[in-house]
């Protein structure tokens, strides 16, 4: 956002929406916001697309921004398009690069699991984009920065809502979260069994800030729980290193990991698509490759 604001010579505004979020405005300013619009109401205690769409749209109508950015998170990828419809404008989703061309946003995103890149322009304002997680370096907080905070009231007519919040259940997982892991070890259906898949956890004992993940096929085969699934129907991650083990590299899976800085493939099929997607690859049976690799790691340790 800071780079775009500099190119446009415009301030950075942040909308804080939720319940009890007023105290977070100083954090937003420290991270680069010039002005923070706070929508603090108990109706926003839990995310509901309808209420948040109204809030974002009403703030946008008051502020009249040229660009609106949201994270391409499970909530963001639902919220972004609904806000675009509300404001009658366009949106680019899951973007990995943002530039200013002729005073308007030009967004780049991956297609077909990273096989293609698409550039999207916008004919009217506001330009809306959801941003792929970890596509940009995070800002370092600067507590000396000053900014302005304004409380905004929005009108959410509860009688018009077609949905309601029921409950929130958080998946319990051991160790570091997939979204926070710098190294991810992902196993596919080619692992063959739950016992084979469980062997991947030996990596996490040797590599710091690492986590185990799965493909949809491995999860459907009950090698692990769905909370580990990466891809279109799972989580989107962008680690520094992504081990793709015994998986084919289908576009549906690559959509969740194509933002990885380095992909290391291990597959006994030399024609597997994953080798086209990876920076490094080993052709071989994972049952022979992984023990040798782990032995080398232990020697380094």
Language-model features: locations:
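N-terminal glycine-rich FAD/FM-binding segment characteristic of electron-transfer flavoproteins
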Residues: 2-301
